[in-house]
Amino acid sequence: MMAASASATTMLLKYPTTVCGIPNPSSNNNNDPSNNIVSIPQNTTNPTLKSRTPNKITTNAVAAPSFPSLTTTTPSSIQSLVHEFDPQIPPEDAHTPPSSWYTEPAFYSHELERIFYKGWQVAGISDQIKEPNQYFTGSLGNVEYLVSRDGEGKVHAFHNVCTHRASILACGSGKKSCFVCPYHGWVYGMDGSLAKASKAKPEQNLDPKELGLVPLKVAVWGPFVLISLDRSLEEGGDVGTEWLGTSAEDVKAHAFDPSLQFIHRSEFPMESNWKIFSDNYLDSSYHVPYAHKYYATELNFDTYDTQMIENVTIQRVEGSSNKPDGFDRVGIQAFYAFAYPNFAVERYGPWMTTMHIHPLGPRKCKLVVDYYIENSMLDDKDYIEKGIAINDNVQREDVVLCESVQRGLETPAYRSGRYVMPIEKGIHHFHCWLQQTLK
């Protein structure tokens, strides 16, 4: 449990600049602003999480149902499918949602509109834009976004699309004084304003106010940068509460830790619907003794506790006192908070990990895992590498499970399943939230 040496840190942080369109916090381009704005950054730095102030910055037993087909993708057919799951049925008697929730392209599109384009979604971490003129890019569904901090320190978010001919404006992350479109050379300030329309004549009267980048709502909450397409969100609201409800303080107590330092990112593409991973995460470790043999030795399952609070499920479990190899990764207790629909914050031992599942299609997603560790452990290269290796292996095992479930859902043999209570109460709660959000 120590801080990694410079060489160890460099070795740990050699990862791609983007992860499924989401920026890698370990990459940073500090080239001169006069360089090509859209060159993919190559330099890497080790971001920290020193700024933890919750700063708010906002811009502008029933019979198995029969399931309808979405061959004709009308709003009524989608809603019919949404209502095939009834949240009023007690979980002991209920069937799980129909397999079509996990396979139909039209249902996936409906999820993007009703879930991912509403409320707050994690876009990146605050250290990516801790300095003026830093920026990063990413994607959410078919939305390409750009987050920047201008020269005066204000944070902005925009659709990453040039207002001239719809070219993607920037890529990767880094530090620049302006954004230059790679197509026709239009120039935008770090605040999204149009600074120059190349070769445009003054008599055309192109209005810079009308041709600036299209803004998104943005907020910084502790280590997380969040964005929103939701126009119903009020300016200046309590971002933590809007995102996490009454669980915000509990999550804040674990995640807003100034001793934590970002050290590594892992990514796991998988051929499965994003909800399969969410379901897997929320089963109160029901699958762990069968699928994760080493991980099972780290936990005392008799102490497992699951609480569902609004749009968050929190799981707590004590670490096992009998560790076969003597390696203590989990510590006294593990805390797992899963914020619906797709983001988890975990604290255990000296670690914090975040798990972000990115929907990429009805049958495809990517898991991005960010690792943080307490400063006192940064020099312990062996501990860090072993801890990351153990957790990465757990995720690879879960990828196999999720892809297997997706294949099973695609077969004509399966329409829906049943819940095993109370261990799967977290999954049932998530499904109820989905139905209420989608209807």
Curated annotation (Swiss-Prot):
Per its UniProt record, what InterPro entries does this chain match? Rieske_2Fe-2S, Rieske_2Fe-2S_sf, Ring_hydroxy_dOase_asu_C_dom, Rng_hydr_dOase-A
Q: Which domain of life is it from?
A: Eukaryota
Q: Which Pfam families match?
A: Rieske, Ring_hydroxyl_A
Which pathway does this polypeptide act in?
Answer: Amine and polyamine biosynthesis; betaine biosynthesis via choline pathway; betaine aldehyde from choline (monooxygenase route): step 1/1
Q: Which GO terms describe its biological process?
A: glycine betaine biosynthetic process from choline
- Cofactor binding, per record: Binds 1 [2Fe-2S] cluster.
Q: Where is the Rieske domain?
A: 120-227
Q: Which reaction does it catalyse?
A: choline + 2 reduced [2Fe-2S]-[ferredoxin] + O2 + 2 H(+) = betaine aldehyde hydrate + 2 oxidized [2Fe-2S]-[ferredoxin] + H2O
Q: Binding positions for Fe cation? A: H287, H292
Span of chain positions assigned to the transit peptide in the UniProt entry: 1-60
Localisation per UniProt entry: Plastid, Chloroplast stroma
Hey, which family's this protein in?
Belongs to the choline monooxygenase family.
**Subunit composition?**
Homotrimer or homodimer.
Can you say what this protein is called? Answer: Choline monooxygenase, chloroplastic
Native organism: Spinacia oleracea
